[in-house]
Regions:
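Hydrophobic anchor at the beta1->P-loop junction of P-loop NTPases
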Residues: 3-5
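P-loop (Walker A) phosphate-binding loop of NTP-binding proteins
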Residues: 8, 20
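ATP-binding Walker
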Residues: 11
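Walker A/P-loop
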Residues: 14
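ATP-dependent small-molecule kinase phosphotransfer cores
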Residues: 32, 36-99
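Small-molecule kinase domains that catalyze NTP-dependent phosphoryl transfer to phosphate-bearing small molecules
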Residues: 90-91, 115-116, 136-186
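ATP-dependent NMP and nucleoside kinases share a basic, alpha-helical "lid"
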Residues: 90-95, 100-137
Length: 188
């Protein structure tokens, strides 16, 4: 069984993943996979090709790519299509031979891969708590955080009957206990 963990910035995915790891389950992070892929020159060249950049660098020039996709929705879509496919394929490959695996996937609904999962757990949190959480770890301003939240999937309008939702509005230990209870319920 492969279970996705997702939620917006500052919702509490990291805390949820920590609780799941404490239970002894394998967790594969999309962000970690992306970092691994960036070490592969073929992947980096694929990123450049996806956004029509003629470049022979073997390391990703984030500014170059950002400039190429800025205000160009077609190139941004091409970039996301390429990177998301590679990330998901690597995650599912690493999941082979494991009975239960959790995938931490920040952009699950944006990428449209939710149907590939046996179960999806969505972490929800009120916006003010999300802003404070991100502020405390990033140094971003409130406006920058709100802008990022607005650019993410609108979890408030998610069909909550299709997915398991865990609300993170208590303290850390209560939330961790809630996550563990939900995981135990899902896995029977």
């Amino acid at each position: 069984m492969i279970i996705a963990i997702t939620g917006g910035i500052g919702a509490g995915k990291t805390t949820a993943i920590t609780a799941i790891k404490q239970m002894g389950y394998l967790v594969i992070s999309a962000d970690d996979i992306y970092s691994e892929l960036l070490k592969d020159p073929e992947f980096v060249q694929g990123v450049y090709r996806a956004v029509d950049i003629d470049c022979d660098k073997v390391e990703l020039d984030r500014n170059l790519v950002s400039t190429a996709v800025f205000k160009n929705s077609e190139k941004l879509k091409a970039l996301n299509d390429f990177t998301h496919a590679k990330i998901y394929n690597a995650m599912f490959e690493k999941s082979k031979n494991h009975e239960v695996v959790f995938h931490e996937v920040p952009l699950l609904f944006e990428s449209g891969y939710q149907a590939r999962y046996d179960k999806v757990i969505v972490i929800m949190r009120d916006i003010n708590s999300r802003i404070q959480s991100v502020k405390s770890r990033s140094g971003l301003s409130t406006d920058e955080i709100v802008s990022r939240i607005k650019n993410q999937f609108d979890y408030e309008n998610l069909d909550k009957n299709k997915h398991t939702v865990i609300t993170n509005n208590g303290n850390l230990s209560d939330f961790s206990a809630k996550v563990k209870a939900v995981v135990n319920e899902i896995l029977g």
